Amino acid sequence: MKTFALFLLTPFLYAQQLTKKYIVDGQTKQPLSSVIIHDIHNYTLTNEDGYFFFHASGDTITIKLLGYKTLKITPEQLNREKDTLFLDPKPIELSEVVVGSNPEILSQVYRKALDNYPNEPFVEDFFLRCVLKLNGDFLKIEDIAGRVKRNKLLGLSKDIKIDFQLLNMRKFGIENKDKYSEDLALLSLRDVFLWYSSLLFLDYQRFNFSAPTIVDDTHKKINHFPKNNNFYDGVGHLVINTKDYSIVERSDKINDAMIDKIPWNKKLWVKFRTSYYSLKEKCESSSNGKYFIASACLTQQVEVHNKAQKNLYDIEYQLVITRPFSLISTFKPNVNAKAELFKLNIPYNKDFWEKQNQLPLTDQMQAFIKNAHNQKGYRIISNF
C-alpha cells in the first residue's frame, strides 16, 4: 500500500450535570450543526445531526449560533426542557457592494489585534475529530482529547511554536489489504492547528473586499475575493464585532473558478491533487478579555487517479476548544506534533469516552464501526 499526503482540570465550583439535547432551526425545524454551547468552564458543539452532550458546571448556559438569537438558560431549566431546543433566526443581512481594497473596518480589526488576541504563551484544552471518507464511505474516524500550547494565536507558520499533550484517543479505520491500493495520510497535529491560525491578516495586495453588510446590531460581514486568478488564494468572509473590532467568524474556501487549473502531483502509478478545501472558524471572548478560536472545521477533497479507477477522498478536521486559557504550569508535551494523526497512539480509556460530552458519534459513524467487520478485503485498525 502506497501512502501519500497532502489535564489537569481546575476544580468546578458547581456540581456537574450531564445533559443531552437536540437543536433545530425554529422556522424550518432542520437540525443545526456547530451550535456553540458553553458555561463559564466548558464548551461544546452540536454534531451534524444537531445533538450535543454537555456537562454543566456553572449557573448559566449560553447557546449561540451566528445568525440566530442567543439563548441563555440555567442548567435546571435546560434539564426541564423537552429533548428538542429551537433557535430563532435573526433578520437576513443586507446586500453587499464590492468596493475594492482595505475597508476602514478591517483596518480597525488589524489595529486592535494585539488587544483582542493572545500574543504570549497560553494553553487550551481541546477536542479534535478527524474523519476520512473514500467515495462517500467512511475509512477512518479519530477523536482526540488533549491540550495545546502556543506562543501566540495568530501569525505566520514560521513564527508559531506549538506543542501538544494528548490525554485520550479513540480511533477506528479500515485499510485495503491490496498492496497496490493507495492510502491517503491525514495531516499532522501541527499542520492542522497552523491552518486554524493562518487567515486573519489578508494581504491587501492580493485581495479585494466587499463593503460591510449588517448581520445584526453588533456584527458586520466583509467578503474577500482574490485580485488575480490563481488556485491558492481563496474566497471567504469575516464577521466582525463592531464593539471591539474582533473577528468572531472566518471562512475561506477554494476559488471554484480555478479548480480546473490546480496542478496534479504524481507518485509511481498514482496522480493526485487537492481539488477542494474549506476552513470555517468561530471565535469567542474569554474572561481574560482575549479571543480564542472556539470551534473550527477544515475540510479537504483529494482526487486520486490510479491505473484502475478514479477516487475521491474527503477529509474533515473538526476542532472544539473545551477550556480556553487553562493552567499553563501543568502542561506536559507527550507527542511528536509533526507525526501523521492516525499514527499517533494513545491507549483507549473506555470510562472517559462513555462520559465525555464532545461531538457525539453520528448515526452513520456508529453504523460504520458496527458493520466494518463484515467488509471483505479490508483490515481493521483500532485502539478499542
Protein language model annotation of sequence segments:
Residues T19, Q27-I40:
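Short, ordered, surface-exposed loop/turn motifs in non-cytosolic proteins
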